[in-house]
């Protein structure tokens, strides 16, 4: 049987046509596909040309394109190329993975503009995508301002997010939300946009929800809420070019010992101060090639969004839900100099400051619940003490804050109405577990302070923080100095607890481990900072500071005012929390612990500051009194129990 060449060619044609439906391209990641195919059109890009994925974009895009990560949130600033990343990944889904996709924007107008200026030029400039769009540039039922239907059978929808009807009927594999923070919280009383939109992917074999936005006001921001519901919040860590320590870039402020720093009124002098070893880093020195995203909650990390590792370095499955944060400091599209210039323009203008926080830092704007005291004003509130222990002080307590390389202690004096005086500041440097360091802490605990009549006062009760170190170190010191004199403490995990909740019985380690309501204590202390005594008149609750730079200076004032109350989304719920913004706050913590020591004395041993002061003043005028201050201290420290 003879077969002509034309018959062979026809047979070949039909075989190829029959097998075409079985053809699948070689698998590619989203980044691989984008680097090979994606093109930035002139209509919507600062610079037209081929796409090249930047180091900080790599993991985000691959996570967006991964079949194993169902939910991706991106909390971002401006100038990081988010919309371009999103569009590149959508093109990847349509052409390479052949998925049905849908994206919502805040309004119908936003959606129409996005389709005209971003989507249509992208289809035109990517040959493999244009080959699937024979209708391009023509009036056709598969080519509308809300939908594009490609010849591979896949559809792309671009809709506004205000109307509930736009969240119905569509069945897709990928649901995306651009500028989620600008969406209504409740879509026509039917629910949140992500709740409604994610219903559209429930029937997909590979469901994907991508949410991204510049954030807005904390506590009401949709992208913040979405991020709070994700178990993983990833920040981009880069190695210091000098010491090699990893850190994510932070803007910082004048009180933080890290972040962007510059000479006043000279933005061109800007550099980054390493938070680990105070190395001076210039923008051009940073190498992001091997940088990685690390979760600030769980420690898991990834460099490329494909391979994921536990905090110990073991490879793990990709997470089901993940949030990335990225901001302008990483972007090659701007400079640190420009960031500083933008910051300087916000001085004295709350509106501009809010815009800077949202669009440059990529952070939510915090509606302050309580006003943070001015450290510089507080630093001027210095008084001359008549003696190391002022006359109206009846009782001394102390708080000890534990750090790996030091212990910090503050001694506070208390008078009637809980009027307070800062008496001493002790910073004991050295390894926290070194016996020589602890012996110097012992000396600080046993130090005495002189009243105007020459009488010596000892510290009656000390609360010592167990957090961050081996708590048995503090337990042993409690046993050494007296179980009721040195009390180990830990912070309460629940908001609104009493300042101190001392147990009636010892724990299994033989000490009275006491829970401290740090939030409650800080609220009370900050309220007291607003009280201003007139002259030397007593004022219940007033706080006094000595005119002694060894004890009180601007640094001490900054630490006492380091924290502020803000609203945050935690596990999908809005909570009011204290936040130090990474500022040093040891002085405030020590004040909290000293106040807790006072409250323990009042609740457990019925300390009466007014009665005690009256007795001490009698002692000042009557040397024949048989009871000494040491006797009072022993009684009130519980040694007579």
PLM segments and residue spans:
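Phosphate/NTP-binding elements of NTP-utilizing enzymes
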Residues: 1-396, 400, 407, 439-460
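Interface-prone segments of viral and bacterial extracellular assemblies
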Residues: 1-7, 94, 477-481, 593, ...
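Short alpha-helical "patches" and their helix-cap loops
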Residues: 73-79, 604-619
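Mg2+-dependent endonuclease catalytic cores in nucleic-acid-processing enzymes, primarily RNase H-like
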Residues: 114-118, 122, 265, 269-278, ...
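Short, flexible/disordered secondary-structure transition segments
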Residues: 130, 371, 601-608
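Anionic group-transfer/hydrolysis microenvironments
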Residues: 180-181, 403, 412, 467
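Extracellular low-complexity, Gly/Ser/Thr-rich intrinsically disordered linkers
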Residues: 322, 326, 334-338, 358, ...
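Hydrophobic, well-ordered secondary-structure elements that form the walls
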Residues: 401, 462, 590
